[in-house]
């Protein structure tokens, strides 16, 4: 989304200014613009690391059989989790592909190569027990906010075209609004796109909204991927598990309070009930504190649309079955937020000799302590001198006291010897 020239300027600014503000080594190789594929791989590594999916399997753990490269025997190990992440601008999916599979055409095989990442998380390149093949795809323009913009362009263009053909004035004034199925009942709004203004009023028909969003699964333009037509590595829905983050969690939790294990029928019922409520009722509920503390009026306004969009993406775009039981929507994992940066650290340091680094880190820490103590902390330096000088003085005083005690003891011994009387030897009586 950021032009290459701006990317280069940001990196140059970092390389120039970070060393001025901080004292650690920072070179040009320490900053880079990563691709969506790299970010997806790092995010996948991070969440699976936190969940312990790279550890050796226990008896109760779900497992998967993995066939990699030229290995004669398939490997059985812990099943990893896939991730779904919908932001405001983009949509991302990443999951392990246990087997290479087959391709219907050379074009599909070529597309698959650009979307599959194979990497080793073992302690060295010979350790093949932790080689993973992960499918990663990022769809720009398919995030919740961008999808709404594309939807507004769609209804503006369609309504103006319909008016031109039928000689009508739908949406040209507040008295004859376009009835938007993706807004709550009675909510009035104005949409401006390409110099054209469309007056809309919500009619809260969630099912119609879902159907109206179907064309948006295609690519927004020729330079971006199409969710409907993009290559997707096969998913074994009978032996897989996914976590949905960001908009997947907000759509299910902030208003509907259904975060956690995703159940399509329950979600559909709750979404339809919400969309069918009048805007006035929703505002009363909002001011009454019935929704999540994270919910605001923007969330209430677009919840109907975003829930329909999430549903379309999940079930029509990625073809998740309606009875799929293993999707969880979440914001935190084990009470902490998992970022892709954790996966980046794990990936970058996977081959480092940690046992050799530990003594080195101790030496570096010791050297850093000396530098801080004797160069930057003058007070501590002078305090050490005072303590040493005081210790020397106390030691000399103690030696002096011991010397005096020994001298006094010697004088007493001499005085005692002077007072000793030498007696002649005794003689017995004569015969």
State what each model feature region is.
Residues 2-81, 91-431:
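Helical "lid/coupling" subdomains associated with nucleotide-phosphate turnover
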């Amino acid at each position: 989304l950021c032009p290459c020239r701006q990317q280069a300027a940001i990196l140059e600014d970092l390389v120039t200014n970070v060393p001025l503000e901080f004292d650690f080594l920072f070179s040009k190789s320490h900053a880079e613009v990563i691709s969506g594929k790299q970010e997806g791989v790092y995010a996948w590594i991070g969440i699976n690391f936190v969940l312990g999916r790279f550890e050796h399997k226990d008896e109760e753990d779900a497992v998967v059989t993995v066939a990699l490269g030229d290995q004669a025997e398939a490997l059985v190990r812990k099943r990893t989790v896939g991730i779904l992440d919908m932001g405001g601008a983009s949509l991302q999916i990443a999951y392990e592909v246990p087997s290479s599979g087959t391709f219907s055409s050379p074009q599909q095989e070529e597309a698959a190569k650009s979307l599959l990442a194979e990497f080793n998380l073992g302690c060295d390149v010979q350790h093949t027990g932790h080689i993973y093949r992960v499918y990663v795809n990022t769809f720009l323009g398919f995030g919740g906010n961008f999808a709404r913009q594309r939807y507004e362009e769609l209804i503006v263009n369609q309504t103006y075209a319909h008016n031109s053909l039928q000689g009508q004035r739908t949406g040209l004034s507040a008295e004859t609004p376009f009835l938007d199925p993706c807004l709550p009942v009675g909510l009035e709004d104005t949409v401006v796109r390409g110099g054209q203004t469309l007056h809309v009023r919500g009619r809260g028909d969630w099912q119609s909204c879902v159907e109206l969003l179907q064309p948006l699964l295609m690519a927004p333009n020729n330079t971006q991927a199409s969710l409907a037509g993009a290559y997707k590595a096969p998913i074994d829905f009978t032996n897989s598990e996914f976590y949905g983050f960001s908009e997947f969690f907000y759509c299910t939790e902030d208003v509907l309070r259904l975060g956690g294990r995703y159940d399509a029928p329950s979600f559909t019922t709750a979404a339809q009930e919400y969309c069918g409520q009048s805007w006035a009722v929703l505002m009363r509920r909002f001011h009454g504190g019935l929704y999540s503390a994270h919910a605001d009026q923007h969330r209430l306004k677009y919840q109907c649309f975003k829930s329909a969009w999430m549903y379309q993406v999940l079930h029509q775009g990625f073809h998740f079955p309606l009875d799929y039981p293993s999707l969880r929507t979440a914001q935190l994992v084990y009470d902490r937020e998992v970022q892709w940066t954790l996966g980046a650290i794990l990936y970058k340091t996977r081959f480092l000799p940690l046992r050799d680094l530990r003594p080195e880190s101790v030496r570096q820490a010791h050297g850093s302590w000396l530098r801080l103590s004797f160069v930057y902390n003058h007070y501590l330096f002078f305090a050490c001198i005072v303590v040493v000088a005081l210790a020397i003085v106390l030691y000399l005083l103690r030696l002096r006291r011991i010397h005096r005690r020994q001298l006094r003891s010697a004088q007493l011994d001499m005085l005692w010897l002077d007072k000793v009387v030498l007696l002649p030897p005794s003689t017995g009586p004569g015969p």
